């Protein structure tokens, strides 16, 4: 059985994230979405809210997908969960450069492998930052996030 971890802050999770999870399910037996607490970042949603939103998004995918929050180093979480493979979505060359540095360090420090996936074309333009910006002006989120995430964003920004 091949299990992978798909880590991130996911603040908020969007359809590009869901695309990577769905496609990972086609390739691997088990996908663990690991949501980082990330206390050094300013976050719109707390860890519990982000875990909740991601769980709702992946519910139709069934038991192949688990969503868990974690605090600390990803490699420590992976060791605890018995995971050795990281899946990362890479949209642009600048993403790849940053992700490659992290992947090389993870490999050297903990012997874990990283697999890079390009998002599907219809999601390549989506980022959590863009979603937050649009939501902060009560703009339309259709085609960017799951309806449940859109509801949570509207509530957070007091949108009608």
Placement of each model-derived feature along the sequence:
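Nucleotidyltransferase catalytic core that binds NTPs
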Residues: 1-160
């Amino acid at each position: 059985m091949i299990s992978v971890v798909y880590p991130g802050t996911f603040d908020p999770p969007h359809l590009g994230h869901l695309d990577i999870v769905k496609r990972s399910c086609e390739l691997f037996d088990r996908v663990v979405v690991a949501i980082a607490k990330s206390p050094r970042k300013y976050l719109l949603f707390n860890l519990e809210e982000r875990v909740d939103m991601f769980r709702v998004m992946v519910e139709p995918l069934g038991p192949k997908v688990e969503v868990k929050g974690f605090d600390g180093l990803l490699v420590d979480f992976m060791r605890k969960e018995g995971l050795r493979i990281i899946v990362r979505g890479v949209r642009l060359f600048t993403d790849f450069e940053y992700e490659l540095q992290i992947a090389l360090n993870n490999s050297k420090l903990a012997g874990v492998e990283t697999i890079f996936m390009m998002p599907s074309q219809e999601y390549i333009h989506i980022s959590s930052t863009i979603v937050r910006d649009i939501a902060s002006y009560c703009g339309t989120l259709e085609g960017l996030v799951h309806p449940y995430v859109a509801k949570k964003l509207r509530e957070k920004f007091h949108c009608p």
